[in-house]
Amino acid sequence: MTSSILILGQNPGNNPKAYHYKNHTIDRLNKWADLFDVKHYSFINCSDVRGEIKLKDVDFNYVQSTVIGYNKVIALGGFSSAVLSRINIMHFRLPHPSPRNRALNDKAELSRILDECKRYIHE
């Protein structure tokens, strides 16, 4: 069975020139998708607000209505996971793929999490 996958990020980064340069976060996310044998996925952010956001900046109705039709939902980081939990959406929480995320320095733990996510996608 082919899964329809939605990945939920937090919000756009602050750099207005990000679209013109290499985006290490998206590059890492795409490498992970390759590891999961995922060729296509949809992506949305919790909010379009740049910079630091809070739960009040999230359009929960938009997130909830967008999730409909997807059978696998993946949250990037704790904020996105909290948003999905608040609206009772089952999901898998991945660490945020930003190069600034120090949790990714533990290669053994990251490998375990990525293997677990692959199993979630293909179950």
Map each language-model feature to its residues.
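A polyanion-binding, active-site-adjacent surface
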Residues: 1-87, 91-102, 108
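Charged phosphate-binding loop/patch that engages nucleotide di/tri-phosphates or the phosphate backbone
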Residues: 109-123
